[in-house]
């Protein structure tokens, strides 16, 4: 169980966010997890550098281990980091410049196979709040270190019918030194 609050204040913006996440093992190799996130932003500039990300974090402070930080196409653009709204599908609303409220849910189906769903509301300046959602199948090859996400349905409709479906598949890959060390020192069973 983790709870966090963050406040950032700059010359041209102020940002406040809070998140709560929990993972519960209810039998051997079976779990469910949920995460709630809220973020609010005041931005006095026309730049989107400080906006909250919906499907991809806006890592202006270089806190995340992104392989393709500024990639918009290709395999590195598909890296997933559970931050900000934490959606696994590339939702049409890509950022929030006023506020965002999101939840990320997942449960084990069988061994490393899970199903997930993300729900949220996004408010951007001069627009009405939007309801956003996605659902899909996840494959935990190594929990928290190497995971694949296969979107099934979202605001875009049935994603599996898309001709470019392979570009929608997301992955998590953690290469931080401390993460790799804890991978080999943690209890596996």
Where do the protein language model's features map onto the residues?
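Short Gly/Pro-enriched loop/turn and capping motifs at secondary-structure junctions
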Residues: 120-124, 153-157
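Structural motif
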Residues: 7-9, 119, 151
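Hydrophobic alpha-helical membrane segments
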Residues: 117-119, 127, 135
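Conserved active-site loop/cleft motifs that coordinate metal ions or position small ligands
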Residues: 114-116, 145-152
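C-terminal outer-membrane beta-barrel translocator/porin domains of Gram-negative envelope proteins
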Residues: 1-110, 123-125, 189
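Residues that define the transmembrane beta-barrel architecture of outer-membrane proteins
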Residues: 12-16, 95-101, 129-135, 140-142, ...
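C-terminal accessory/binding modules appended to enzymatic or scaffolding proteins
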Residues: 111-121
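Outer-membrane beta-barrel "beta-signal"
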Residues: 137-146, 165-189
């Amino acid at each position: 169980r983790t709870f966090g609050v963050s406040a950032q204040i700059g010359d041209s913006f102020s940002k406040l966010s809070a998140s709560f996440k929990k993972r519960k093992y209810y039998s051997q190799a079976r779990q469910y997890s949920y995460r709630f996130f809220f973020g609010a932003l005041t931005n006095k500039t026309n730049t989107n550098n400080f906006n909250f990300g919906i499907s991809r974090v806006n890592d202006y402070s270089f806190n995340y281990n992104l392989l393709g930080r500024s990639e918009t196409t290709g395999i590195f653009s598909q890296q997933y980091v559970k931050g900000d709204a934490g959606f696994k599908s590339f939702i049409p609303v890509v950022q929030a410049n006023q506020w965002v409220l999101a939840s990320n849910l997942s449960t084990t189906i069988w061994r490393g196979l899970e199903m997930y769903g993300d729900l949220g509301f996004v408010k951007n300046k001069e627009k009405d709040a939007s309801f956003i959602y996605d659902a899909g199948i996840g494959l935990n090859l190594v929990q928290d270190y190497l995971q694949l996400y296969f979107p099934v349905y979202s605001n875009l409709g049935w994603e599996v019918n898309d001709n470019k479906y392979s570009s929608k598949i997301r992955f998590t890959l953690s290469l931080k030194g401390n993460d790799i060390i804890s991978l080999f020192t943690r209890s596996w069973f």
